[in-house]
Swiss-Prot record:
Site (Stabilizes the phosphate intermediate): 87
Domain of life: Eukaryota
UniProt name for this protein: GPN-loop GTPase 2
Pfam families: ATP_bind_1
UniProt function note: Small GTPase required for proper localization of RNA polymerase II and III (RNAPII and RNAPIII). May act at an RNAP assembly step prior to nuclear import.
Binding-site list for GTP: 29-34, 187-190
GO annotation, cellular component aspect: cytoplasm
């Protein structure tokens, strides 16, 4: 297996798949496929040629997908022939792709220079524990593809302190395990308060500020009070690394999608490439943080109930 991989990687050095792309990851229901379609539409409007690569053997084929793992094998046939459950079958599919990357390389060869959007499976274990998918992404990087991981998380988890701490732990574990330039995204911002009110301003969650306030929120619940020390330790780990922040996104808000693309281009190095060598582009990267903060304020005003007060007035209470 190792010899075959080495031989394949040597061949990749001779015929590199030069290009950029996004590995779109995240738990089920976080909006990965919707994001991929919206991002492809945005890239088309910008005149950037892109292609969808469907690496999820469980879902339906993306309309217009240039490559689909289901052409190699599908989840249903694995479950039927090997008598595995859904989770075991998905892990088997990823391991099978890992061992047959020559198939994927052959399919990608005709897409050299095209911006790739990798729609990945939604099983969290693939990003936090299992080695197959990170190895596949690493090998793609060895072929000359400069990928950025875009990790989508449903924004309504912010309304539940316990769930948000779990999201932070999952995001941190994913960042350390996948080992790619990484952008965390709070998706479906237009539905953020569908299941409850936010305890703090939106920027508290996007910037992952002092988590001791969140732990205190948990202690108000008798069920979580006995787990206070556990939550304090988890919060300490997250703050010690200091890696996790989020960008807000609503597919209905084209400007927020553009900001995510700008952050991805900066992380992957696309904005410094020959296709976009201009002083204006470099300056836009330098001030990107200000635009992101403005975007967060806009989402706060538009989608978060604030009892008639402005964001500035609520900020004074923190």
């Amino acid at each position: 297996m190792a010899d075959a991989c080495s031989e394949m990687d040597r061949g990749a050095e001779k015929y590199p798949l030069l290009g950029f792309g996004q590995a779109v990851i995240g738990p089920p229901g976080s909006g990965k496929s919707t994001y991929v379609r919206a991002m492809q539409a945005l890239l088309a409007r910008m005149g950037r040629k892109s292609a969808i690569i469907n690496l999820d053997p469980a879902g339906e084929d993306e309309p217009g997908a240039a490559v689909s793992l289901r052409e190699l094998l599908g989840l249903e046939e694995v479950m039927s022939e090997l008598r595995l459950g859904p989770n075991g079958s998905l892990l088997y599919c990823m391991e099978y792709l890992q061992e047959n990357l020559d198939w994927l390389r052959a399919r990608l060869q005709g897409l050299r220079g095209t911006y790739l959007l990798l729609d990945c499976p939604g099983q969290v274990e693939l990003y936090t524990h299992h080695p197959a998918l990170p190895d596949i992404l690493r090998r793609l990087g060895g072929w000359g593809l400069r990928l950025c991981a875009v990790h989508l998380v449903d924004s309504h988890y912010c309304t539940d302190p316990a769930k948000f701490i779990s999201v932070l732990c999952t995001s941190l574990s994913t960042m350390l395990h996948v080992e790619l330039p990484h952008i965390n995204v709070l998706s479906k911002m237009d539905l953020i308060e569908q299941y409850g009110r936010l305890a703090f301003n939106l920027d508290y969650y996007t910037e992952v500020m002092d988590l001791s306030f969140l732990v205190e929120q948990l202690t108000s619940d008798p069920f979580f009070r006995r787990h206070k020390r556990l939550h304090e330790k988890l919060a300490g780990v997250i703050e010690d690394y200091g890696l996790v922040t989020f960008m807000p996104l609503s597919i209905k808000d084209d400007k927020s999608l553009q900001l995510v693309l700008s952050a991805v281009d900066k992380a992957s190095g696309f904005c410094f490439g020959e296709a976009k060598q201009s002083l204006g582009n470099l300056m836009s990267v330098a001030v990107g943080a200000d635009f992101q903060f403005t975007s967060t304020l806009a989402f706060q005003e538009k989608y978060v109930e604030n009892d008639g007060r402005t964001v500035e007035e609520e900020t004074l209470d923190l």
